[in-house]
Amino acid sequence: MIRWLAAFFCSLIFAGVAPAKPAFEIREKITYSTVGDRALLLDAFIPNAAGTHPAVLVVHGGAWRSGNRRQLRAYATALAERGFVCFAIDYRLAPKHKFPAQIEDCRMAVRWIRKNASHYKVNPDRLGAIGYSAGGHLVSLLATTGKPPSDTNGNIDTRIQVAAAGGAPTDFRWFPDNGRWAEFWMGGDLTSKKELFLAASTAAFVDAGDAPLFFFNGSADELVPEAWTKACYFALKSAGVKTEFYSIANAGHMQAAMDPGALEKACDFLASVLVPEHKTAGSGENAVSAQGDPSADSSSDSAISKDLDHECFVGKPVG
């Protein structure tokens, strides 16, 4: 009897409480490009709030040969809840599709977003990207190699304003086995395909005009060690580009992908560029932090910079 009365009174208390309205809607399986007979799809996460919003391209990982647009739904959801329009994309995968197919698809997605901005409440001048692992590599490459329109006949700008790259390899010019591990993706080793390895190397394209870049990486990541990501971080820092590196203590490659602290920092960094009025405590250019403690990584820059010559990049650059 007591249990029944408790349930009855609870029902009275909550009877007038309507379910919370979702902060955004999801539109799935939208074709952003067709290559041959293959339709490339995306899912759009659109805030319900009125007006236009900054947009973020979400690019999945999977070693450039697996994965799909649903893989980083947690990233898209977190950003959409903050008021960003998010577009999570599929792209062509190796070994059937060799590089540069993957980055070409990312650029096609950027063009599509800008072309269709008015249909998705997007401010086309505020476009960023986030990705992890292979996706982190691709968004970092977007940030350093985007191109302005080459003419006035409808060509659309592929430059983005900011990127957040997690677990991202950024330099493919140095490898101990001559890059044979990447033959499935490049179509050859470092000697035979040196131009492609160079074209895939984010760090090789860094200059002062690049978009700001936020990196996050697990300190125990053996698949993509921090030194591999730091190659680009140091290059950007030297060029005077706004950049941050967030180290996730004791995290491996998969653990770092869903670290809530890293995702929050990435969202904050994207907002700091795409939403000019956005402010976060302790934010600033070229900040390095580990588990939210800036002092925890105060000596790591010099230590990891020394590792660049022997931990990940054993051998000599080709070309």
Language-model segments: residues:
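Short beta-strand element of the alpha/beta-hydrolase
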Residues: 52-61
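Mobile cap/lid helix-loop segments that gate and shape the active-site cleft of serine hydrolases
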Residues: 35, 173-205, 211
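Short beta-strand/loop motif that positions the catalytic acidic residue
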Residues: 215-217, 221
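N-terminal cap/lid segment of alpha/beta-hydrolase-fold proteins
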Residues: 21-50
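C-terminal catalytic histidine-bearing segment of alpha/beta-hydrolase fold enzymes
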Residues: 43, 216, 227-292, 301-315, ...
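A fold-wide structural signal in alpha/beta-hydrolase
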Residues: 55, 80-87, 92
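Primarily recognizes the serine-hydrolase "nucleophile elbow" in alpha/beta-hydrolase
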Residues: 111-177
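Catalytic nucleophile-loop/oxyanion-hole region of alpha/beta-hydrolase
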Residues: 67-69, 75, 87-124, 256-262
